[in-house]
Amino acid sequence: MKLTFNINYDTVFGEEVLLNIVETDSKGAKKTSQFRMNNRDGKHWWYELNRKEATLNTSLDYYYSVDCDWADSRHEWLTETHRLELSAVKGREYTVYDHWADVPEDSYLYSSAFTECVNRRPLPSIRPSAYDKTVRLIVRAPQLRTFEQLAVVGKPKSMGAWDVFKALPMYEHNYNEWIVDLNVETLDGEVLEFKFAALNTADTQHPLWETGMNREIHLPEIKNGEVVVYELSQAFFDICNRKLAGTLVPVFSLRSKTSYGIGDFGDLKKMIDWVAVTHQRVLQVLPINDTTTTHTWTDSYPYSCISIFALHPQYADLRQLPPLKDGKKSNDFEALRQELNALKQIDYERVNDAKQKYLHEIYQQEGKEMLKSKAFKQFFADSEQWLVPYAQYCYLRDKYGKADFSTWPDHQVWNEKERKQLSTPSSKEYKEVEFFYFVQFVLNQQMEAVHAYAREKGVILKGDIPIGVNRNGCDVWMEPKYFNLNGQAGAPPDDFSVNGQNWGFPTYNWDEMVKDGCKWWVRRFQNMNKYFDAYRIDHVLGFFRIWEIPSDAVHGLLGQFAPSLGMSREEIEGYGLHFLEDQFTKPFISDWIIDRVFHERAAEVKQRFLNHTHDDIYELKPEFSTQRKVEVAFEGKTSDADIWLRDGLYALISNVLFVRDRKDPNKFHPRISAQFDFTYEALYDSDKAVFNRIYNDYYYRRNNQFWYREAMKKLPKLVQATRMLVCAEDLGMVPDCVPWVMNNLKILSLELQSMPKDPHVRFGYLGSNPYRSVCTISSHDMPTLRQWWDEDFERTQAYYNSMLYRGGAAPHPLPGWLARDIVGRHLMSPSMLCILSVQDWLAIDEKLRLADQNAERINIPANPKHYWRYRMHVSIEDLMQNTDFRENVTELVCQSGRE
């Protein structure tokens, strides 16, 4: 069978267009074969491919790319490639006319969030045609809704003679891509004139015509047995952009009458029911990966995962497991369940201990048979790459009583040679770790079932991908080459934390990751695709540059962006600032600073912690020269006076004007937020002005193009690794290059009215939100709406008058009717998604919401040791039965057009 591919693409000397055929082997692995195309004039490219092995009713997926001698090659959008169906019974030769496909503006409509949840239409099998001569039309129409089908109508009688009710129906052979084969013998003349129409399968009397002029194709001479394929430009219809509403709630925060003191995957199903019944379409959760390092409450931090693949055992729905045969044990577990479920907050340690014991009991009772099942064998085959190392890591962590593998007596790094023994059921090593296989199998089955259930209900499950991983976790243990362990990831100062955030995660070795095409990240995203149809990239700024903090620092103020372009002494002095290296890069400590920080304890501080150097200048004693040393010195001291003293010493240590580059000791970076510190205060006014210019150039201009290129090395591969809808958390110190990249890749931004991206306004204007965005009132890192309302009365008053357009004094606490008004305004915004926390939804009902608004806070970012234990005070069953609240939410959603 002869296949000829044609595409018009303007090139310059040195550029070549390549045809890339994508084939899938028996194991599901994709292999791409490249063919250099021929060229007549630098614009028209073609390639003739002979496929002896081609068979009827098969298809070929392919895309085009451009190879270039002097720059990176580029390729088409890969989320949906071209597809050629070999479905013509008499077809011996296919001639294809394609056009180049970049990322479309409406790429979100091709995401599984829309194709599998919102506009769900099952793809039919290939439909053969049996014409002697065939013209095939292929067109994309992503706007079509679930109940619509594309049809073509044209001038020839065989195409309906412009009677739309006699139009030829097309079929969807790929997501949002429709196809029809035409018999050339029934077409009139050499010019084919036609148009597309959307037919309502439920209401056939009101078809919808595509916009624009009639389409025309000048038909070539077509031989018997030839199929000429035209891929046409997208069909557009007068259909409004879809807007959807949703709820954000961590899985652990869910409460049902039958849960085990913490939300689980069974509760998640129940929450999907509530979301669906209130006409919402999105349910967003926080990360659900395993975080277990100490088996204590400090493991409650969901963003510190030990494995990017493994799910947390605490989310196992024990109700779905076979009942315990031991009646006494069963009764004991039930009594404990009722006790834990009655608690207002999560008791992380007791809950996890109880669930682990129950899982062990079920494993002893049922594990042998479950691990013989076909389902387990398939799961193991699909997951072996990460599952085997994870299981051994968990076994060794528990055996040695600590997760810090660098202190283990053996196995300080994963040994690939041990995989075979750990994968052989008859081996001793397998027996040691098979419990962890069992638990992950149970969790995977339950979460996949939740995902399928959400799709059936038309609800988009939205997950969360943390930017970091635990430095003592399995991922670092297994593949240390991908991580830098000589620093800590965090965030610069922002509205959440004046000292910045230190997450303690290792930073990524992007040079190593990019070498293999970011396979580690691609595997991560593809694994997440099993459970979700949309995801939030936590701290997307980390893909441009990460805030890297020295290992000996506690706060984030001494960090620097990595990678970034540091400044030489000569560059700094070129601005007009005489560079005093010792004074600017070492803590500047003088009498007046000590007095300002420590007041009446100044003399004590000088004696205990400082050495006098000259005049009124001091330096820290060697044993207190870093924040980590100070932290160790004050370990166990918890009085307010001791904490105040410790924090004062932290402030002295971070009192520098520049920090030295982490790789090049001759390069420097302006210290973040230095203008609020004493070393800046000590400068002459003229030097302050110069430093401000250096600071603004460095943070807002100098690195823009550099960071843009860094992000474009990584993000395109990741967002096109799956068909999930991509959303980003782009808050904080956002350089100009971030919206450039997000717009190129069509990533949804996050919009909060209380944290506007425009630095010139106090509150964002909801009507200015871009369509491609997620609108919310508060995130898990922020106070809830009710807390925010009472935090700062002056700010609230300004918001009440200027944004809600109400006169008089703002009422406190926030009344339900006013919370409803605020929620309604957010729902009316242009944003594609409006996802509100469950606490903010509950705020509209004074009878239902929690009396203590401060008990609703999920996380306080300024506190790295925060206990994540918030739990809904009302059960999902009660939410479902509360008719008034359910109808209230439904009315708000429907009035905003977000059904």
How does the language model describe each region?
Residues 106-136, 183-186, 208-209, 216-899:
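Catalytic cores of glycan-processing enzymes that make or break glycosidic bonds
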Residues 96-100:
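Boundary detector for helix-to-coil junctions that initiate low-complexity/charged tails
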